[in-house]
Structures are given as structure tokens and as C-alpha cells.
Amino acid sequence: MEKDIKLAIQLEEEYLNRKVNLHDGTANIYEYLNQAGYDNIDEYNNDAQEYIITSQDYVVVEEPYINIELALPYMQAEKPALLYSINCGEKYGFVPNSYDNESLLSQYGYKQIKLGYDNSNGPILSSDGDLRIFIVLNKHPYIDIDNLFFHKKLKNFLLQYYDDVKIDNNDILINDKKICGGIINNYSNNILVVVFQINFIDKYNDIINICGKSQKIPGYIDNKLLDAEKIKNEFIKWLHIQ
């Protein structure tokens, strides 16, 4: 039987209604998914995520830089969007709200940009020529998006150019050097935001001086081998943007 992901998602909703709202403990997810050609829950989950992400009507906007203020109108309007920046003309340090050493960033020529949330990490340094991606997408009421959905796609793409590519938590390493960091965050009950910083500029000394030494060695992608525009275009393909 040919798989029908749209039907499968509708059938999962019927299953959840029966199990949760009607308190029917005999409800079996496979009885529902089999009607749409699925007998493997992992395959269904992967296809469902792909469908939810790629069936949205995104706008693509090039920005001089990326920060929470530029993305906010799309987030508040619940309008799916891919914002990106390559040629920003300045150096930026993206920091959690609690970061309090703006003078150190300024000393090395970086303009501080608050991320709008807190985490345990220090500044994320970004230079003219790096690729910054900010995706706004609508959440589904019961289908969760894997935190590493885009990491896995990017890793597989990079393996076309490099033999040694790994995912390490929220980072991607090439030849054991960190070239990329990315996160998926809940903005509201209805909106997810995906943020990526992909390094094409050598910032090794600045990262060591500002962030201190880390177990992960800072690295970057050689733009003679692979440029930022090409990776940006891959994100557009992954979102099925025409």
C-alpha cells in the first residue's frame, strides 16, 4: 500500500482523540497508521516532521544581520520565514540575556546582540562572510520537531565535501573542529524558531580570547570548497521553498 502522510497525520489525530479524550486504553496507533500505509512508527515520525516543515508558506528575506528584533514581526504574525545574512559588514557577538561583558566584545571589534533568552554558553561570534540562518515556523499541535532535524540534513550535505562530519549536541564538527552551532527554540505555543551560525571566517584567536578555551576547537568551512550561498540554498530546498 502506498504511504499517504497527510492521511496518516489525520488518523493519528483520531487515535489521540480516542485514547486521550475518550480514555480508550485499547486504542492502537498501528491500527490507524496501517490504513495510510505505515507499519513503522519511526518512519512515520520522520515523514510527519518533513511534511509539517515543508508544507508551510515561507518567505525568504536577506537581512544585513540577524537578531531577535528583525525576526519578531514574523514571529508575532505567525508567518513562516527564512531570514539569512552573509554580507553583514560588521562583527557580532550573540549573547544570552545574562551576559555582562560587552566591553570585552567591543575590545575585539564585536557588536553585542542579545539572543533574547538565557543558556549556559558564552558569546557566539559572527563575522562578515559567515552564514546566519533564522527560521520561523508554525508548530503542529501534536507532532514534535526533532531538535536535530536540520543538523542531520546539514551533516549529510557536508559529507559530500568532507569525510569527517559529526553532530555533537547542538554543534556540527568537521575534522573535530566546531564549524556550526544551531538550536530550535519554542517562541510561543504556536511558533518554533531555528537559529544557525555557520562559520566561514577564521575566528580562532577571537573565540579563545573572548570565550576562553573549550574542548571543541573552533573551525570554519573553506569557502573555496563550499560557499555560504550554496548552504543557504540547501536550507531553501529543505523547506521546499519555490
Please tell me what each predicted stretch does.
Residues I5-L7, E14-K19, E50, N138-K166, ...:
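Long, positively charged amphipathic alpha-helical accessory segments at protein N-termini or as interdomain linkers
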Residues K166-N185:
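Beta-rich nucleic-acid/ligand-interaction surfaces
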